[in-house]
Amino acid sequence: MSTPASTPAPDGSHQRDHHPGTRVEFRGVTKVFTNNKNTETVALDDVSLTVEPGEVIGIIGYSGAGKSTLVRMINGLDTPTSGALLLDGTDIVGMPEAKMRKLRSRIGMIFQQFNLFQSRTAAGNVEYPLELAKMDKAQRKARVREMLDFVGLSDKGRNYPEQLSGGQKQRVGIARALATNPSLLLADEATSALDPETTQEVLALLRKVNKELGITIVVITHEMEVVRSIADKVAVMEAGRVVEYGSVYEVFSNPQTTVAQRFVATALRNTPDMVEEEDLLFHEGRLFTIDLTEDSGFFAASAIAADNGVSINVVHGGVTTLQRQSFGKITVRLTGNPAAIEEFHRSLTRTTTIKEITR
């Protein structure tokens, strides 16, 4: 697979495919829908959020959290009831449709259900937005070949969607989204219809898009594993609000809200559930679940406890490395000198989060 180099624009000029990416900024955006009975539904509630050029941000939340409304705002399919939405410093709220159409040419989008034309080949699907852009035929064909090669489908150009696997269809969708040389890519539940192995392949391709082409990527998902695999930052949404925002490491290692904690737990099973706790409590000793970070003090406290007659066994949990930093939770069973166990507990209370598991 090759990396696209330069692309002829419809006017014949050449554009570099690697660019700084688009900056996206929400400023106090609220969206209220009113039905025919004048009942109001708040889909977005005072959302303020900034995505820097070249970043990959994961927007995560359960159904009804406001994720899809957020992405529809970015490509101009919905407009805020109040607030401002800026792309590269330009407020697009109230922008005339002609200007909005031009702006959309800088935005690519991929979907959960691929949205391919069944009557067109893979190459024909990738070519479609170039036809709309009135690109010269020879240039279109060259660009299609370039894009199919970039996504690893150089031998599938003549295949129709029904002849492709789910992962291949999504690759065609990505190639089509990239065909017009966008600076922003919106991925709306792009891996939800794929099996785990294919999901990782598609995420690897999106990482390649970001790293090699410099494109800003906004990933809408309800799967924390997707965020963990690809994102630099994560925004957690609930009831139309961004309730938590930070680097992937910050949110995974120390989630502050209940909804964020639930999402993190689906990706990192480091804490025993109720059934596992009951099994562990059958045995002698005291059980503690401990947050591990590079400065948690666990290993120093463990060494002191061991020197004072305490046996320490790890019975559950694990350590994860994200963004070159390690963190995790472990559950340990301590037996031996009661006073030394209590000192171990007090010591870690000062440096990290430690919780005793009791009946």
From Swiss-Prot:
Tagged with keyword Nucleotide-binding: yes
Major subcellular site: membrane
CDD domains reported for this sequence: ABC_MetN_methionine_transporter
Gene Ontology terms for molecular function: ABC-type D-methionine transporter activity; ATP binding; ATP hydrolysis activity
Pfam families tied to this protein: ABC_tran, NIL
EC number: 7.4.2.11
Region entry Disordered, spans: 1-21
Keyword Membrane applies: yes
Keywords: Amino-acid transport, ATP-binding, Cell membrane, Membrane, Nucleotide-binding, Translocase, Transport
Residues annotated as signal peptide: none
InterPro entries (UniProt xref): AAA+_ATPase, ABC_transporter-like_ATP-bd, ABC_transporter-like_CS, ACT-like_dom_sf, MetN_ABC, MetN_ABC_transporter-like, NIL_domain, P-loop_NTPase
Reactions it catalyzes: L-methionine(out) + ATP + H2O = L-methionine(in) + ADP + phosphate + H(+); D-methionine(out) + ATP + H2O = D-methionine(in) + ADP + phosphate + H(+)
Superkingdom as given in the UniProt entry: Bacteria
GO cellular component: plasma membrane
Residues reported in the UniProt entry to bind ATP: G61, Y62, S63, G64, A65, G66, K67, S68
Residue span, ABC transporter domain: 24-264
Subunit: The complex is composed of two ATP-binding proteins (MetN), two transmembrane proteins (MetI) and a solute-binding protein (MetQ).
Family to which this protein belongs: Belongs to the ABC transporter superfamily. Methionine importer (TC 3.A.1.24) family.
Biological function: Part of the ABC transporter complex MetNIQ involved in methionine import. Responsible for energy coupling to the transport system.
Name of this chain's protein: Methionine import ATP-binding protein MetN
Name of encoding gene: metN
